[in-house]
């Protein structure tokens, strides 16, 4: 893997990880269009560590408060407040993607990154996002989260295992269908992703150096630089996206997803672009 590839792909990762457009799908498309090869699921997972570090820093106060309340609540019932419950909701919501990720890890690394599937997922899931925007009541606050919400949003996060769907798109859409305010759904989805993405990145770290049968390998310095770039760009993307959601809908991203999906399908159909 060249340094140009590392820089471009890590910028793409940082820009798209928190937007409902699928970072893994964009990495697969960018790799094929500009570098004629897929960066691979392992490189994607490791660069996601950078963007998750951005989440940890951006939500540091929230995370610290949740962890403190969770441990206090375990020892004393009087400390079982909304943050204590939110800690449990994150734990419970993480279980589904942990199970599905382990069961289908081989499919995720290979066939699921086929650009026909990526482009189709971009288009099809845009309909889901649009429906969530249209039908979601958007009245519930974070204090009104329930166990049912954590399970449903956690199951929705599993859809992100397929490149082209989008983790934030899936979790925010689920939250909107459940009546959560748009920015509340986004914040909960970002918190929910932290355990899963950190575990996936650390688990994939060895394969990023020496991938077996998929993608390009990267050196240690390249992975460090990629992670740092993804962190910086990702931090800026989080700040912008959360402000954007306060006064804007996700219909903008729906249109973008459809256009990108159609363009990729056209390039694949005409033979300009290879599927894998």
Swiss-Prot record:
Positions of transmembrane segments: 1-21, 39-59, 84-104, 115-135, 159-179, 188-208, 222-242, 253-273
Subcellular localization(s) per the UniProt record: Cell membrane
EC number: 3.6.1.27
Record keywords: Antibiotic resistance, Cell membrane, Cell shape, Cell wall biogenesis/degradation, Hydrolase, Membrane, Peptidoglycan synthesis, Transmembrane, Transmembrane helix
GO biological process, one term: response to antibiotic
Coiled coil: none
Enzyme kind, highest EC tier: hydrolase
Membrane topology, as annotated: Multi-pass membrane protein
InterPro entries named among the record's database cross-references: UppP
Catalytic activity: di-trans,octa-cis-undecaprenyl diphosphate + H2O = di-trans,octa-cis-undecaprenyl phosphate + phosphate + H(+)
Gene Ontology annotations for the cellular component aspect, listed alphabetically: plasma membrane
Molecular-function GO term, any one: undecaprenyl-diphosphatase activity
Free-text function comment from the UniProt entry: Catalyzes the dephosphorylation of undecaprenyl diphosphate (UPP). Confers resistance to bacitracin.
Family: Belongs to the UppP family.
Additional free-text comment from the UniProt record: Bacitracin is thought to be involved in the inhibition of peptidoglycan synthesis by sequestering undecaprenyl diphosphate, thereby reducing the pool of lipid carrier available.
Protein name: Undecaprenyl-diphosphatase
Gene behind this protein: uppP
């Amino acid at each position: 893997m060249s340094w140009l590839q590392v820089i471009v792909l890590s910028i793409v990762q940082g820009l798209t990880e928190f937007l409902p457009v699928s970072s893994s799908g964009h990495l697969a498309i960018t790799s094929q269009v500009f570098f004629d090869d897929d960066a691979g699921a392992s490189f994607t997972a490791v660069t996601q560590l950078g963007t998750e570090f951005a989440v940890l820093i951006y939500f540091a106060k929230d995370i610290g408060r949740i962890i403190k309340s969770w441990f206090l609540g375990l020892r004393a019932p009087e400390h079982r407040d909304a943050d204590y419950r939110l800690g449990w909701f994150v734990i419970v919501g993480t279980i589904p993607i942990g199970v599905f990720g382990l069961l289908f890890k081989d499919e995720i690394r290979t066939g699921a990154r086929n650009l026909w599937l990526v482009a189709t997922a971009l288009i099809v899931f845009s309909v889901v996002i649009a429906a969530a925007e249209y039908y979601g009541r958007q009245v519930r606050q974070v204090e009104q989260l329930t166990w049912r919400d954590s399970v449903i949003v956690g199951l929705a996060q599993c859809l992100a295992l397929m490149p082209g769907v989008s983790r934030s798109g899936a979790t925010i859409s689920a939250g909107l269908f459940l009546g959560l305010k748009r920015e509340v759904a986004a914040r909960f989805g970002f918190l929910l992703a932290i355990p899963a993405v950190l575990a996936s990145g650390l688990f994939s770290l060895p394969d990023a150096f020496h991938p077996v049968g998929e993608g390009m390998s990267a050196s240690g310095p390249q992975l460090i630089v990629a992670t740092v770039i993804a962190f910086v760009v990702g931090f800026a993307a989080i700040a912008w996206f959360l402000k954007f959601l306060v006064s804007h809908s996700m219909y903008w991203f729906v249109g973008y997803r459809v256009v990108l999906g159609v363009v990729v399908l056209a390039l694949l159909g005409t033979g300009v672009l290879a599927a894998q």
